[in-house]
Curated annotation (Swiss-Prot):
HAMAP family in UniProt: 23SrRNA_methyltr_RlmC
Source organism phylogeny: Bacteria, Pseudomonadati, Pseudomonadota, Gammaproteobacteria, Chromatiales
EC identifiers of the protein: 2.1.1.189
Active site: 337 (nucleophile)
Residues annotated as binding [4Fe-4S] cluster: 3, 11, 14, 86
Domain of life per record: Bacteria
Reactions catalysed according to its record: uridine(747) in 23S rRNA + S-adenosyl-L-methionine = 5-methyluridine(747) in 23S rRNA + S-adenosyl-L-homocysteine + H(+)
Protein family per UniProt: Belongs to the class I-like SAM-binding methyltransferase superfamily. RNA M5U methyltransferase family. RlmC subfamily.
Organism of derivation: Halothiobacillus neapolitanus (strain ATCC 23641 / c2) (Thiobacillus neapolitanus)
Keywords: 4Fe-4S, Iron, Iron-sulfur, Metal-binding, Methyltransferase, rRNA processing, S-adenosyl-L-methionine, Transferase
Record-given protein name: 23S rRNA (uracil(747)-C(5))-methyltransferase RlmC
Its job: Catalyzes the formation of 5-methyl-uridine at position 747 (m5U747) in 23S rRNA.
Length: 379
């Protein structure tokens, strides 16, 4: 992939970009295998990505001033670097940058100055649905004083940006490296952005977590579904389920109950909306932390034979690993964005062995990757 920002040295977010893509894949495979050395298992071929225009989400720091805004990143001196032509983004996102800059200029919204600790607009977050190029745009502001002016400008912005489906404001008042605050105000009639994966609808709300590489995510979920079908359990849990990616994909191969658990109430609302639209009677979603759920699960009349887990980078942790290891669960399908924490968790579950694993390149040109692993009980 050719990137003028990388060649000039102004942006090094894609740390592996100097390496040919085939070499990147080999390095990722070797890194993941090395992290899980001695744990057994068969490694399936790595699933590659498109090299450009694969990201469905842009997180842009807003810099400069209201008359000349800059969308991109901060350098080491907290000065802005405009990345409006970043090749990671599809056309629908890159074409949205100029209308959004025009809106900032039109309303005179001052970008937040990190060094001076003053200003209002901190981030622009843009998500695209590859279904129809519709967009969800979030403005992260220091205060709510611009909300009514943004609402009054909505018809103008929509005329300039006809693919806009959802516009929201997030209030993040503190001077800290925190992306978003608690308060979210949606300014459009629509509250969700619809994205289809493998024909299944997902309704994204502004705070919903969603994999940033749509096409590779489809392959991740399809592979997990095929592995679940191989095991053919009666019931299944999906822990850290987000908007229901694994649960919804697996529902048609589970004759019993599929239960999704996720701490984010907003993500659970999205998952429930998808299940209702699909007419799924055997799927339920609950807004609970995974550890809170397992505290309640010990009293349930039946445990599933299979559990899917997709924890954050830190992994499952001691408590959840111990619960799974001591339970009657026979198979764990573990989706991990951190092979080191995956390896730590496997060591803490000696009752299971790694049967197979596959790397999915959700994050090209970086050291990051997603590993899907099947663990089967041996004692």
């Amino acid at each position: 992939m050719h990137c003028a920002y990388f060649e000039r040295g102004t942006c090094r977010s894609c740390g592996w970009l100097a390496d040919p893509y085939a070499d990147q894949l080999q390095r990722k495979m070797a890194r993941c295998q090395s992290a899980l050395t001695g744990l057994g298992g068969v490694w399936l071929p790595i699933v590659p990505s498109a090299e450009t225009a694969f990201r469905n989400k842009a997180k842009m720091v807003v810099c400069g001033d209201a008359s000349s805004p800059c969308l991109g990143i901060l350098d080491a001196d907290d000065d802005g670097i405009d990345l409006s032509n970043c090749p990671l983004y599809p056309t629908a996102i890159t074409e949205a940058f100029e209308p959004l800059k025009q809106m900032i200029r039109r309303l005179g919204i001052p970008p937040y100055d990190v060094k001076k600790r003053q200003g209002e607009l901190k981030y622009l977050l843009i998500t695209v649905s590859e279904d129809d190029d519709s967009l969800m745009v979030r403005l992260v502001l220091r205060s709510d004083i611009w909300i009514e002016r943004l609402r009054a400008d909505l018809s103008t912005l929509t005329a300039d940006l006809p693919h806009l489906a959802v516009l929201s404001v997030n209030i993040q008042p503190v001077h800290q490296a925190i992306l978003e605050g608690e308060q979210e105000v949606i300014l459009t009639d629509r509250e969700t952005l619809t994205v289809h994966l493998n024909g299944l609808p997902f309704h994204l709300r502004p705070k919903s977590f969603f994999q940033t590489n749509t096409r590779v995510a489809e392959q991740l979920y399809a592979t997990a579904r095929s592995w679940v079908a191989e095991v053919a359990p009666v019931h299944m849990w999906d822990l850290f389920c987000g908007v229901g990616g694994f649960a919804l994909h697996c529902a048609d191969v589970i004759p019993g109950q599929v239960t999704g658990i996720e701490i984010s109430a907003e993500a659970i609302a999205s998952a429930q909306q998808s299940a209702l639209e699909l007419g799924l009677k055997n799927v339920s979603f609950h807004a609970l932390g995974a550890n809170e759920f397992i505290d309640q699960a010990v009293s349930l009349p039946q445990m599933p034979a299979l559990v899917v887990v997709n924890p954050p980078r830190r992994g499952l942790g001691v408590g959840l690993c111990a619960f799974l290891d001591e339970s009657v669960v026979q198979t764990v399908i573990y989706s991990s964005c951190n092979p080191e924490s995956l390896a730590r968790d496997l060591v803490m579950m000696p009752g299971f062995e790694l049967v197979k694993a596959q790397v999915f390149d959700l994050f090209p040109h970086t050291a990051h990757s997603e590993v899907l692993a099947m663990l089967v009980r041996v004692r």
